[in-house]
Amino acid sequence: MRSRVNERFRKAFDSLPEDIQRRARAAYARWEQDPSHPSLQLKKVHDKHPIYSVRIALGWRAVGILQGEDMIWFWIGSHAEYDRLLAQLRR
């Protein structure tokens, strides 16, 4: 499975604290080696669409949509923002 990011993700990533950016890069490296690695806590977060989340660090998540063999990461942020995003996606 390949991984890509969109512009929205890039902008959100750039606004993260440096420590979280480092952790996100480490999570990405883990994902490249094994998307099902337990530390990523990969889970499907939408009933109808192939939308998944992974854990970046305690209190931080990334969200993407699976399109064929590509995971398109479109969001990254704090867990509080993640909860709000999921509420919007599930409407």
Specify the residue positions occupied by each region the protein language model found.
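Short, charged low-complexity linear motifs
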Residues: A12-L16, H46, W60-G68
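Enriched for short, Lys/Arg-rich terminal
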Residues: R2-R4, I56-R91
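Tryptophan-centered motif/residue detector
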Residues: R10, Y28-W31, W73-W75
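Arg/Lys-rich, positively charged N-terminal/basic patches that mediate binding to nucleic acids
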Residues: M1-A27
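A short, surface-exposed loop/turn module that caps and links secondary-structure elements
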Residues: A29-V54
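Hydrophobic alpha-helical segments, especially transmembrane helices
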Residues: R22-A24, K44, I56, A62
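Residue-level signal for pocket-adjacent positions within structured domains
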Residues: K11, P35-L40, G77-A80
